[in-house]
Amino acid sequence: VSPKPFASARSTSAQGFTFFPPELASQAEFEGLSPNGDLQGADELLRERYFRRIHGYPANASTDRELVALILEKARRIVSHPTRPTFSEVLPYTQAPFEELALEESLDEDPTLDAVEALRVERQRERRVRCVAMLDTSSSMAGEKHLLASVAVAVLLLEMPPEDAGLCVFSTGARVVRRLGERKSAQATVLDFLRTTPKGFTDISLGLRKGHEEAVRSGSSARSVGILVSDGRSTEGDDPLPLARRFRTLVVLHLDGPGSDLAASQALAQAGGGTCLVVDDFADLPRRLYDAVRLVLRR
């Protein structure tokens, strides 16, 4: 039995005109996409290789490796210096004799600093944060948007430790591309994402459910955060708000444009205890995902 749709696939404006969601128009236009169009922020060689692939040119391991390498190169220009959040812990000197002396804490223990066992040192440790990204791969994400989304995926993989980055995709269905705790290479993950053909409608609730299930499965839901990449407009499925509330923190990257619903994206972020970052130009998606990951790591 099909689930009750949360939003109608066809809507009527206040003026009485009937319009269809972007998925329907994009599905019809997908085969006609031209590799001669404009793609801001992407190298021409990258763009050429991508469109040759989706237009049916023979693909093999060599051409796939070349395309993935170009995507990762593009991502590295955004993630120039990966950052890792840290926190300080104070330990007895005898446990970590090569760390920096914590003078104030040592004086509290022994004002004379004569007793070695009273000395304290400070050590920086990496704070583990696990992140599940959920990307819309409906028909409205076809072509150039799919290419830019693959660069955004690469940004996530370069910025996060391998075992702390999970990736789900959703449209009419949903699947996990990379599991939390899995040490799948960035190259294999990007290629797997590229093999996901954008199609179908947008079921945000299904994407959120799949992402949260992955966080629970990994046993780290209490310290996992979600990043949802969507235009906020569900065209099928259930109300996504109850699913957003399951996350400890949910950051929403709102893809602004015709037919998008900023208010819905903001409501999802609020329900998930996070924030909504607006992507005004789709070419900015990789960098805005970088901003989102850095925001997540600082929490």
Regions found by a protein language model. Give the residues of each.
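Acidic/polar low-complexity segments with low predicted structural confidence
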Residues: 1-128, 185-186, 286-288, 292
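Short glycine/proline-enriched coil/turn segments at helix->beta-strand junctions
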Residues: 111-114, 129, 161-162, 246-249
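Von Willebrand factor
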Residues: 126-182, 186-229, 233-236, ...
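Short, hinge-like loop/turn segments at secondary-structure boundaries
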Residues: 183-187, 268-271, 294-297
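Extended, charge-rich low-complexity interaction segments
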Residues: 191-208, 280-298
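VWA/integrin I-like adhesion module and closely mimicked acidic/polar interface patches used
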Residues: 232-272, 277-280, 290-291
